[in-house]
């Protein structure tokens, strides 16, 4: 005898129920306008609610949310069912999109990396990642349709209740989904509930097609010729089988289910706001149902008063040493509490029942999860009971039809006032998951996949992102991980690395990118004086541009050069600025370039347009030496012409057509570093502006070098301008910094705050306590978030996007880890592996 069969035998059996078809078990008569008509004449509405990250809100915000929820409970339908369903995260759409993009990828290195990324998503999705859906279920309050309640009246009443719910849940921060086809959406919810296992392999649309084909074939109908016969809704959503023969579990669609309820007297005297979060986030295979029934206020007061009088009469005949005396005295005290709450605080009385559904693939796993759930609730001072020999009643109760079993209701119901009922607010398990985005990691609170699409203009006002973290928190690792995954999605990535640029080289080479080193003696050069064609043919076609009517390209370039020279010569006088401006115009004039835009082209009609030969710093140096007032500038510029940095005195010899480009500035020291960053930014910015139809991202590591105390206002303004306007060019500006004091060091932090305010997305890694307090107001962090951030381990972060915040554990595939790790032990292991492969 196998262990499984032995366990099942021990579980005990009862006489099998006579159930011919599973379709007959589902009490659905019709589904129209998103309203379910049940076989017993009730009308049900199911709404899906998007959760919020309740537990990361401040105490004040939590209180306001619960108050808004309590306000709605006062006017809500009398009977309510709140339902949460937990299941394995479905990453199929995201993976399918990645595979489709991989098919068009030309780089073999990128294809290989994409396969590793897909394996990571599958692995995390199958082992760790969960997703949760939340539902509000209410009904038309008349039990049966009568002459005075036609279907139009029923629809109108339910629609009004839905609109009220939307308004109040919006105050809580929750969005109620509005599907294009309410009937299809409701049917999909029911199909998912009854077919938890099958819905993974056979989506609802596939199930519908199969049922239609089978029905047509069974009735000898020809598809495309004969009309489709009427098919009951239950046929589309019914599971393949339901086994109701066991005392302590059922089997439905190949999964094992068991049911628990919190006893009516099994609650603690006080609970915290959001206490349901512990149940909701308990893990895989745990669903929660909360039933609320609001009592008539005037009748309740009369009943409570009558009960108090009766109990006081009984109490007089008892001795105070009796065991029942204390119980009766407590009942009287509770009665006064209810009466006072209703009369003085405008509260209602509710009857509440809470059910927990436990599911698993095997009986042993089911029993283990069930015990874990029982122990967890016990630790919260809540006591549960098993629905032994009542499994069918329990299943009918937790079905999304708002039909609680009277027997189970009697055992589980607990009377609560509005404030107590509001504490059951369960829509707290927020997920940040966009199928079109890139995976960042796993949500620490609920194990859901955290997939963020920075470029989703429907959700984000801009795609900008700030990365903040102390040294060693994983800032560079996270930036590279984000860049690699964007590259896999076909997004153009430019990385500017002013410090430790070598950390970016390995990943750049492995993905087939271009590594450009800007430094004295480097073979790479970007001519700072080059005027570039910044509009692609596609944008010329879209905008119908006429270059002759555009602002002067020469004037724009000179403006950029003035920023460059202000970084090089911070103490330049107004007179020197004027003389420099004139010298620049004369230098370009020698090459035939004027304020006439046509003058910058050698062949305007070529594809791409061919530009004239541009002057270099040496040409400007010659012009500066001719004027006594600019000789000081000429002396400083000579370093780039005849001195140690003469490698800057060349025509541009790098190509930015590669989709993954790293500009390494780490060899530039002192004053040369901000100058080099300006050269790199100027070049990249011109490329970004050329085509607004393509996604691109510019990533600036250690941005404090440009906007911090060691920079100047003009450079900071240029950098801020990028963050302000890059959205209009289809791009994202991503910055990273670890020195927060310098980040906010220029002009009392004006530029640091402005860049953060112009970035709707943030990744906050571990910060020191003083750093966290320093940016608390700027980042609008709560005390809870500050406490979490200061305790983060390496690779943990708080993701802030679209006014939502999620704590995540950042995940990388084996291939990505090898490409971007800087950990000494991991590098040593990689070296040994490569040496063994070489041998």
Residue spans of the language-model regions?
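Extended, folded cores of ATP/NTP-driven motor/assembly subunits in large transport
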Residues: 2-427
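P-loop NTPase motor domains
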Residues: 25, 35-36, 45-53, 59-78, ...
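Hydrophobic anchor at the beta1->P-loop junction of P-loop NTPases
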Residues: 467
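Walker A (P-loop) phosphate-binding loop of P-loop NTPases
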Residues: 472
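Conserved lysine of the Walker
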Residues: 475
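Hydrophobic positions on the alpha1 helix immediately C-terminal to the Walker A/P-loop
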Residues: 478
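A short helix-turn-beta junction within AAA+ P-loop NTPase domains corresponding to the substrate/partner-engaging
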Residues: 512-516, 749-764
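Conserved P-loop NTPase
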Residues: 781-835
């Amino acid at each position: 005898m196998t262990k499984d069969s032995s366990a099942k035998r021990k579980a005990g059996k009862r006489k099998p129920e006579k159930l011919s078809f599973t379709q007959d078990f589902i009490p659905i008569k019709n589904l129209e306008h998103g309203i379910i008509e049940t076989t017993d004449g009730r009308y049900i509405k199911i709404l899906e609610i998007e959760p919020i990250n309740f537990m990361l809100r401040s105490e004040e915000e939590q209180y306001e949310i619960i108050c808004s929820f309590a306000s709605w409970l006062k006017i809500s339908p009398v009977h309510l069912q709140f339902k949460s369903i937990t299941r394995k995260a479905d990453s199929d759409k995201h993976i399918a999109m990645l595979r489709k993009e991989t098919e068009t990828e030309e780089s073999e290195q990128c294809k290989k990396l994409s396969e590793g990324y897909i394996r990571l998503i599958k692995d995390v999705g199958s082992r760790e990642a969960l997703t949760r859906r939340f539902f509000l279920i209410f009904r038309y309050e008349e039990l049966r349709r009568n002459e005075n309640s036609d279907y139009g009246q029923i629809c109108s009443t339910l629609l009004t209740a839905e609109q009220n719910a939307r308004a109040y849940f919006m105050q809580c921060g929750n969005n109620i989904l509005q599907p294009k086809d309410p009937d299809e959406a409701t049917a999909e919810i029911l199909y998912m509930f009854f077919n938890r296992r099958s819905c993974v392999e056979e989506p609802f649309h596939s199930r519908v097609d199969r049922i239609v084909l089978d029905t047509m074939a069974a009735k000898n109908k020809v598809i495309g010729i004969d009309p489709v016969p009427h098919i009951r809704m239950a046929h589309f959503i019914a599971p393949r089988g339901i086994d109701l023969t066991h005392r302590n579990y059922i089997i439905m669609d190949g999964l094992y289910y068991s049911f628990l309820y919190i006893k009516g007297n099994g609650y603690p005297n006080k609970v915290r706001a959001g206490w349901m979060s512990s149940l909701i986030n308990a893990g895989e295979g745990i669903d929660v149902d909360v039933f609320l029934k609001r009592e008539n206020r005037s009748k309740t007061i009369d009943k409570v008063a009558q009960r108090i009088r009766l109990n006081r009469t009984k109490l007089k005949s008892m001795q105070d040493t009796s065991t029942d005396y204390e119980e009766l005295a407590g009942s009287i005290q509770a009665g006064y509490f209810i009466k006072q709450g209703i009369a003085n605080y405008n509260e209602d009385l509710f009857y509440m029942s809470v059910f927990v559904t436990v599911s698993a693939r095997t009986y042993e796993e089911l029993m283990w999860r069930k015990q874990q759930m029982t122990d967890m609730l016990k630790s919260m001072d809540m006591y549960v009971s098993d629905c032994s020999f009542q499994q069918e009643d329990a299943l009918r109760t937790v079905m999304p039809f708002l039909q609680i079993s009277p027997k189970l209701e009697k055992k589980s119901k607990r009377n609560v006032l509005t404030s107590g009922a509001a504490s059951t607010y369960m829509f707290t398990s927020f997920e940040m998951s966009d199928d079109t985005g890139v995976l960042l990691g796993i949500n620490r609170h609920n194990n859901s996949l955290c997939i963020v699409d920075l470029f989703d203009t429907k959700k984000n006002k801009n795609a900008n992102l700030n990365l903040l973290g102390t040294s060693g928190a994983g800032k560079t690792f996270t930036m590279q991980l984000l860049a690699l995954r964007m590259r896999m999605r076909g997004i153009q990535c430019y990385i500017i690395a002013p410090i430790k640029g070598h950390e970016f080289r390995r990943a750049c080479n492995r993905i087939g990118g271009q590594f450009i080193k800007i430094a004295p003696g480097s073979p790479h050069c970007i001519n700072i004086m080059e005027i570039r064609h910044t509009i692609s043919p596609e944008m010329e076609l879209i905008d119908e541009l006429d270059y002759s009517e555009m602002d002067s390209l020469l004037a724009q370039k000179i403006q950029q050069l003035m920023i460059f020279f202000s970084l090089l010569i911070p103490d330049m006088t107004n007179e020197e600025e004027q003389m420099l401006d004139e010298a620049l115009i004369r230098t370009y004039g020698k090459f035939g370039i004027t304020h006439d835009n046509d003058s910058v082209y050698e062949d305007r009609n070529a594809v791409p347009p061919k530009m004239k030969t541009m002057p270099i710093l040496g040409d400007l140096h010659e012009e500066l030496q001719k004027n006594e007032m600019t000789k000081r500038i000429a002396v400083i510029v000579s370093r780039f012409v005849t001195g140690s940095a003469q490698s800057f005195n060349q025509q541009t010899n790098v190509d930015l057509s590669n989709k993954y480009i790293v500009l390494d500035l780490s060899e530039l020291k002192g004053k040369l570093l901000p100058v080099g960053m300006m050269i790199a930014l100027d070049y990249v910015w011109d490329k970004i502006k050329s085509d607004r139809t393509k996604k691109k991202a510019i990533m600036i590591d250690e941005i404090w070098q440009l906007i911090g105390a060691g920079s100047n206002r003009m450079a900071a303004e240029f950098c801020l301008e990028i963050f302000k306007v890059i959205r209009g060019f289809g791009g994202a500006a991503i910055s990273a910094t670890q020195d927060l004091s310098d980040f906010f060091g220029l002009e009392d932090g004006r530029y640091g705050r402005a860049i953060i305010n112009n970035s709707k997305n943030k990744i906050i890694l571990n910060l020191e306590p003083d750093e966290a307090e320093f940016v608390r107001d700027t980042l609008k962090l709560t005390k809870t978030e500050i406490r979490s951030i200061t305790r983060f381990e390496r690779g943990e972060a708080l993701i802030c996007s679209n006014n939502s915040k999620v704590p995540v554990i950042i995940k990388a595939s084996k291939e990505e880890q090898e490409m971007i790790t800087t950990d000494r032990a991991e590098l040593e292991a990689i070296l040994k592996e490569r040496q063994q492969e070489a041998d």
